[in-house]
Amino acid sequence: METFTWRYLGHPVHCVQQGASEVDEESPALLLVHGFGASTDHWRHNIPVLGRTHEVHALDLLGFGRSAKPRGLSYGGSLWRDQLVAYVRERIGRPTVIAGNSLGGFAALAAGAALQSDCAGVVLLNAAGPFSDEQQPPKGWGAIARQTIGSALLKSPVLQRLLFENLRRPATIRRTLNQVYVDKTNVDEALVESIRLPSLDPGAFGVFRTVFDIPRGQPLDELFADLTAPLLLLWGIRDPWINAPGRRSSFQRHAPQATTEVVLDAGHCPHDEVPDQVNAALQDWLATLPQPST
């Protein structure tokens, strides 16, 4: 596996790649996108397997993992969408399947819609993001914290710092992961450290503070309407964070007609919890895609 630094908006972005010299160049490349607070390390059980048949890339979104966490950036879906679009066009240079988990799923869908013919497919694993017809505000760390503590108090930098310090404690990270993994076998020290270590970077607290004000982003139904590539929905159906059965119903109402679905007995991060099942489902679906024209 090759690791390297790519630059976006002048900032260093951590990337990994596997399989480029060993696979058929006629098959689409694959770009993997992590969720909030995670990194390329979260694809530890997927890259080695998928790299046997495809050119596989993964990157850390700006603000996360080993990538830069600069002040002054407007963190949110638009930034991460544009980062993925630039990476596909500048680094990969051919049609690419983009797969994302949680927040990374929203960014993957937005990038896939923007890339048009440069996108060979989109894979969403328990993706985040709103629909136009949703009346309730989006859920996530910000919503949970507001309900628990109160919106007014969260404007306090002191309270934000205390919350941040608690959330990055190893015991808190492990407890949170145990809540969203049904099978806890892979909730190990390596996973906990992959989340904790980036939180020690000087800019990490600044990125964390933005989570309370990240804009909702373009509705998923609008992105589905703009998407011209095949779509695969991979569900960890026992995800307690997003009410996966209800969320799945919303996706079924709005997703393109030819969408493929795979439902797994897993939580919020099926790619790491049940990687063998996710890898098999991905490889089966990838084999059905038309060969891209280069």
How does the language model describe each region?
Residues A38-P48, R66-K69, A107, D133, ...:
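Short N-terminal helix/helix-N-cap motif within the alpha/beta-hydrolase-1
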Residues A113, V122-Q160:
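Flexible "cap/lid" loop of the alpha/beta hydrolase fold
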